[in-house]
Amino acid sequence: MRSKRFEALAKRPVNQDGFVKEWIEEGFIAMESPNDPKPSIKIVNGAVTELDGKPVSEFDLIDHFIARYGINLNRAEEVMAMDSVKLANMLCDPNVKRSEIVPLTTAMTPAKIVEVVSHMNVVEMMMAMQKMRARRTPSQQAHVTNVKDNPVQIAADAAEGAWRGFDEQETTVAVARYAPFNAIALLVGSQVGRPGVLTQCSLEEATELKLGMLGHTCYAETISVYGTEPVFTDGDDTPWSKGFLASSYASRGLKMRFTSGSGSEVQMGYAEGKSMLYLEARCIYITKAAGVQGLQNGSVSCIGVPSAVPSGIRAVLAENLICSSLDLECASSKDDSSSSV
């Protein structure tokens, strides 16, 4: 007979969560979809003519962008011929230096690096992450918002956040025209708490850039990239337009990251039957190809999607590891709680 205590615990909402059945055709699978391409590359006269089983005649915008700018072609064929299990072991081996691995990982195709991390369990990925992170010292970011967009409260909370040790602070707005007030309040409050804190205001991208140009923010992060072409074009974007936006920030010396996360293509309905991790790998390669120094990923606000299927959280850690392995600063993010989706 089961005790009443365990019956009561089992009925709690937190214990009602469980995995749902994978839906491969719609990309509702975290890792190793049968529709994921096999790793391959062919280079003719310094140009990629085949990428992950797809000839250049069938490339979409993302394939073209990655093939031209995202892969170190000097060692690509050598690395693609290496055993993926051996490469996975090198990633988590503390005796193999990061400086030895980055030239290899940056010469892989998206499908190859996904194959490599798919051989690793969570503990091995954690060990690899300690070694592969691009940032010298890990740090924390805080969100500073309130329901009424009250700039005085934002400034006060920002000061406390800075005093408590947060090196980056982000705010956003419900009404776009309030953005300058929120951005300035966050900037002033954070510097009162502790000089040197970086601040951002998450908005529609043109407005966000304008705030940076005016000096109201110190950096930007919410410049979204996606792993399939239909999701890009649905937002009137291409990898090239995102690259142009990145160069606009760079022209004023503003730090910026792209943002992506596994599950976004599933939510938008354009996953093309690929796994969430493979599509996220394409996002990471777009970031590398655009010359951006870092990426906010880790499923972010889509976390309820990968966490609902088997190996979902493992895939989220894997995308963070891929980001760091491509020598990008990884801002690991989870903006939502799994049980709220």
Q: Where are the language model's segments positioned?
A:
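Anaerobic metallocofactor- and corrinoid-dependent redox/one-carbon enzyme cores
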Residues: 1-157, 163, 168-341
